[in-house]
Amino acid sequence: MKQIETLVFDYGGVIVNIDYASVVKAMESLGVTMFKRLIHFRKIKRLIYQYINGLVAEAVTLKEMLSLCREGTSTEDIEEILEELCGNLPVERLEALVKLRKRYKVYLLSNINNTLWQKSVSLMKQLGYSTDELFDGVFLSYAMRKEKPSVEIYEEMTQMTGLDPATTLYFDDRAENAQAGRNFGFQSVLVKTNHLEEHQEWQDINKNTKE
């Protein structure tokens, strides 16, 4: 195993804590009952990830979601619930990222739409941090028009940064993304969603910042 020089982090479920199940359950207030959730499970899951990734116009996705809600529901009502996907951002992780940048190149690679990202940037600012302080570069699906786990998004990030996959440690909480990164040559860590601190690899790189 080569010495680590670069760190690549997913955002949702890795840097920020997100409770996807509570978002789906919150849709009950808009008429998406338990029965509907069971019947339309695949569709609801697809629409949520489609909204997050930002490769389909948000208005198109929201309109499709609206068809599952009770009459009188507006897209604004849905957006208010989907804002919960911005999640809870532990300031301790942001503090750690700043320290990690003193020793490593640190990049963010996330499937996220423009609305959620701008709200996330605002949340970081409220906690006293800018993306420039936290990351050497940010790579987002909605801006790149590519999404994980497609090899193209890893290729473009590598070309733009000049990073060496063999010396890159990659953290992602979705198995297909972690595997795609591994196939690309990264040293991948499949993160237990919202529990980054439990992983030995995270603990080890943070120990290195104290040496």
Where are these regions (language model features)?
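Asp-based, Mg2+/Mn2+-dependent phosphohydrolase catalytic module
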Residues: 2-4, 113-114, 120-211
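N-terminal helical cap/lid subdomain that shapes the substrate entry/recognition surface
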Residues: 2-91, 102, 116-117
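Generic structural signal for small/hydrophobic residues in well-ordered secondary structure
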Residues: 10-13, 54, 108, 138, ...
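Anion (oxyanion) recognition and catalysis
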Residues: 98-102, 182
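General nucleic-acid-binding
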Residues: 104, 111-113
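Proline-centered loop/turn at the N-terminus of a beta-strand
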Residues: 105-107, 187
